[in-house]
C-alpha cells in the first residue's frame, strides 16, 4: 500500500512541478521553504486572502442588484435587503467583511512592525501599497449605500483635496465630476470600487512573489536557511485552523450583531440639506481621522493624515538596531505597546465630538504616533545597541 501510494503520488508531484501554471502555485504555497518556528501571528496573511475572496464574491453578487444612481442607490440597497434571496446576508457579510479585513490587516501590520518584517524592503513596500489601496477601496465602498454618513463622509473627505495650493479646487471638482457630490461622483466611485479589488488581488500575488524571493521572517528574527520546512502541510494545516476560528468569529458577528460596527445615520437616505450632528468614518479610519482633526490648519491636517500612512515606508530606513525584531529588545518592546495603546486611543478619539478634552488628547496622541516612528524607533535602537552590544576594551 505504501509503495502504491508513493508511486501514485509521484506523477502528481511531477505534474505540479512541471506544469507552467501549477509550478508557480507550487513554488508559492506548496513547496515554499518556510522557517520551522512560525507562530500563529503569521496566520493573518492567509486570513487576509480569505477576506478578499469573501469581499469579491459578495461584492459581485451585490453589484448585480445595486443601482449607482443618486435617486435609486438607497432604495436598491433596501431592495437587496428585503427582496433578493439571502440579500441581507450578502450585504451583512460584505459590510462586516470590510471590518474583518481591516482587523486582520492591522494585526498583520502590527506583527510586521513587532518582528521587524520591514527589513525585507520589497515585501514591506508592496504591503504598504496594498494597505493604502485597501483603505481607498473601503472609502469608495462606504459611499455607495448613499445614506447620510455616506454622502457627508464623501463630501468631507474629498473636500480635503481643496487644501492643495493653487490646484486643490480644480482637483476636487474633477473628482466630483461637478460642483458638488452628485450622480457623477457616485457612478465613478462605484466603478472604481468594483475595479480596485482585482488590483488588490494582483498586488497580493506580487506580495507573495516578493516573499518567495526574499523568504519569510520568523519570531526570533535570525536567518533560518538551515531550519526550514515545506509550507504544505506544516503551515497549510495551521492556516486552516486559523480560518476555522476566523469563520466562527465572523459568522457570530454577522448573525448575532450585524449592525454593531455600523452607523445609525447611514440608515437615513442622503440629504444634502441636513448635516449630521457628528460626521465620522468607519472605525478602521478613525485613527487617521483623529490625526486629521488634531491639527487646526486644513492643509496641515491633510498632510498629517496622509503622513500617518506613508510613514510606514520609512520603517526600514529608521531601523538602527542590530537585532531585527523586538523579541530581544526590552526598551523597544515597551515603546511598541505604548504605540498600540496610542493607536487605540486615536481610534476612540476619532469618534468623539470635537471639543475639550478630546481635542488636546487627540493632539498629544498624534504627536506620540509620529514620535514613535521618527524619534523613539531609531533612538531606542541606538541605545539598545550600546546596552546589549557594549564595545570590548
UniProtKB/Swiss-Prot annotation:
Alphabetized Pfam families for the sequence: Cytochrom_B_C, Cytochrome_B
Gene3D superfamilies named in the record: Cytochrome Bc1 Complex, Chain C
Subcellular location: Mitochondrion inner membrane
Binding-site residues, heme b b562: 94, 193
Cofactor (UniProt): heme b
Record note on cofactor: Binds 2 heme b groups non-covalently.
Top-rank taxon, per record: Eukaryota
Known role: Component of the ubiquinol-cytochrome c reductase complex (complex III or cytochrome b-c1 complex) that is part of the mitochondrial respiratory chain. The b-c1 complex mediates electron transfer from ubiquinol to cytochrome c. Contributes to the generation of a proton gradient across the mitochondrial membrane that is then used for ATP synthesis.
Protein name (Swiss-Prot/TrEMBL): Cytochrome b
Originating organism: Metridium senile (Brown sea anemone)
Upper lineage: Eukaryota, Metazoa, Cnidaria, Anthozoa, Hexacorallia
Gene it is expressed from: MT-CYB
Amino acid at each position: 500500500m505504501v509503495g502504491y501510494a508513493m508511486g501514485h503520488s509521484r506523477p502528481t508531484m511531477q505534474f505540479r512541478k512541471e506544469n507552467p501554471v501549477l509550478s508557480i502555485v507550487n513554488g508559492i504555497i506548496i513547496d515554499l521553504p518556510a522557517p520551522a518556528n512560525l507562530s500563529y501571528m503569521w496566520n493573518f496573511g492567509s486570513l487576509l486572502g480569505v477576506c478578499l475572496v469573501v469581499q469579491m464574491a459578495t461584492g459581485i453578487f451585490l453589484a448585480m442588484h445595486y443601482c449607482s444612481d443618486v435617486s435609486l442607490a438607497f432604495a436598491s440597497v433596501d431592495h437587496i435587503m428585503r427582496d433578493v434571496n439571502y440579500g441581507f446576508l450578502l450585504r451583512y457579510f460584505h459590510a462586516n467583511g470590510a471590518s474583518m479585513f481591516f482587523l486582520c490587516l492591522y494585526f498583520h501590520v502590527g506583527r510586521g512592525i513587532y518582528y521587524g518584517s520591514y527589513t525585507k524592503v520589497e515585501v514591506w513596500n508592496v504591503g504598504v501599497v496594498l494597505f493604502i489601496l485597501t483603505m481607498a477601496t473601503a472609502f469608495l465602498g462606504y459611499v455607495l449605500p448613499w445614506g447620510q454618513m455616506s454622502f457627508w463622509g464623501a463630501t468631507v473627505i474629498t473636500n480635503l483635496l481643496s487644501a492643495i495650493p493653487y490646484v486643490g479646487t480644480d482637483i476636487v471638482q474633477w473628482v466630483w465630476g461637478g460642483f458638488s457630490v452628485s450622480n457623477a461622483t457616485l457612478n465613478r466611485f462605484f466603478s472604481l470600487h468594483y475595479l480596485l479589488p482585482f488590483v488588490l488581488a494582483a498586488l497580493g500575488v506580487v506580495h507573495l512573489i516578493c516573499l518567495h524571493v526574499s523568504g519569510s521572517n520568523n519570531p526570533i528574527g535570525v536567518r533560518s536557511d538551515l531550519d526550514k520546512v515545506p509550507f504544505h502541510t506544516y503551515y497549510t494545516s495551521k492556516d486552516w485552523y486559523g480560518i476555522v476560528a476566523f469563520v466562527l468569529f465572523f459568522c457570530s458577528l454577522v448573525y448575532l450583531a450585524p449592525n454593531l460596527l455600523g452607523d445609525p445615520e447611514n440608515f437615513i437616505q442622503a440629504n444634502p440639506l441636513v448635516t449630521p450632528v457628528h460626521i465620522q468614518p468607519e472605525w478602521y479610519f478613525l485613527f487617521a481621522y483623529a490625526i486629521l482633526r488634531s491639527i487646526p490648519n486644513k492643509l496641515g491636517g491633510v498632510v498629517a493624515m496622509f503622513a500617518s500612512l506613508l510613514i510606514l515606508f520609512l520603517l526600514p530606513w529608521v531601523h538602527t538596531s542590530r537585532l531585527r525584531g523586538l523579541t530581544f529588545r526590552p526598551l523597544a518592546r515597551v515603546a511598541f505597546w505604548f504605540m498600540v495603546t496610542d493607536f487605540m486611543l486615536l481610534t476612540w478619539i476619532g469618534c468623539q465630538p470635537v471639543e475639550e478634552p478630546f481635542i488636546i488628547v487627540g493632539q498629544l496622541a498624534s504627536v506620540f504616533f509620529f514620535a514613535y516612528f521618527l524619534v523613539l524607533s531609531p533612538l531606542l535602537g541606538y541605545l539598545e545597541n550600546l546596552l546589549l552590544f557594549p564595545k570590548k576594551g
